[in-house]
Amino acid sequence: MKKGCKYGTHRVIEPAGVLPQPAKKISNDMEIFSNEILIDVIALNIDSASFTQIEEEAGHDVEKVKAKIKEIVAERGKMQNPVTGSGGMLIGTVEKIGDDLVGKTDLKVGDKIATLVSLSLTPLRIDEIINIKPEIDRVEIKGKAILFESGIYAVLPKDMPENLALAALDVAGAPAQVAKLVKPCQSVAILGSAGKSGMLCAYEAVKRVGPTGKVIGVVRNDKEKALLQRVSDKVKIVIADATKPMDVLHAVLEANDAKEVDVAINCVNVPNTEMSTILPVKEFGIAYFFSMATGFSKAALGAEGVGKDITMIVGNGYTVDHAAITLEELRESAVLREIFNEIYL
């Protein structure tokens, strides 16, 4: 076996000299290098922003969605939406471990894992799309994938169904970042708080701010409000369109005694919500953009344009122990687990 670069640069076809994630095309030849792991793929969880874009482009026609996904993988060697630039993650079974990783990894052949690196950099071959579940952004396939030496993963827990674990691990970075960023007594606004990542963030934020803090959940409609109310009765819920910054600002200020918030978290899966996240944040506060629909230039120039001196964290989906933190939420909260079971199983 030949040895490749631990970051996967040996798989890059075009353009030369870049890493796999920004590459336009990578090799999805499934003959592994000595420091790679071959995965027999069970399902892809497409990033929410990516799936939404593909679905809208396809006119919500499932067969056209299938064709678009196959086209992307055939052209790029990976599942990276050319419009959003994002990917998702996968679950599968370890089929083969490269010679250089035997004894160095805790994985063994037959382990079921979820990859915690983006599909936007993961070599992928799709042999067949078995089923698509648009309501949960899931694509069940027959296919193979490669995990690089530097790739992170989680062995699927035995105390919950694999689809439940997959749903949570798909957005593991969001609640784990909340655990790091949010402090006692703070005020926090969460946009898209009734979505998968949003509900987990809301639950974690309530824990972190404690009894003297405040968590404000921004949702689109009464249906989402009812769902978020089930997650926690300690979340102050407001209805506003996240693409309308002034509406969001006024709603958040009204819910927070006319004060700006310490932290705003964006979990929305559509574009043009940057300023709705930035405007409600107080001077020297934090805006965390988990959403892959975030535009860096819109956020940076937008904050500058309104004179906001705030810390902005854009799209950082990984933090240490993020998988453990997120799965623990489902163990702690019977209500969260019940909701996830209803939606994602």
From Swiss-Prot:
Assembly and binders: Homodimer.
Catalytic activity: (3S,5S)-3,5-diaminohexanoate + NAD(+) + H2O = (5S)-5-amino-3-oxohexanoate + NH4(+) + NADH + H(+)
Identification of the protein by name: L-erythro-3,5-diaminohexanoate dehydrogenase
Gene3D superfamilies named in the record: Medium-chain alcohol dehydrogenases, catalytic domain (3.90.180.10), NAD(P)-binding Rossmann-like Domain (3.40.50.720)
Domain of life: Bacteria
SUPFAM superfamilies per the UniProt record, alphabetical: NAD(P)-binding Rossmann-fold domains
Keyword NAD: yes
Free-text function comment from the UniProt entry: Involved in the anaerobic fermentation of lysine. Catalyzes the oxidative deamination of L-erythro-3,5-diaminohexanoate (3,5-DAH) to 3-keto-5-aminohexanoate (KAH). It can use NAD or NADP.
Keyword list, A-Z: NAD, NADP, Oxidoreductase
GO biological process, one term: L-lysine catabolic process to acetate
Similarity annotation: Belongs to the KDD family.
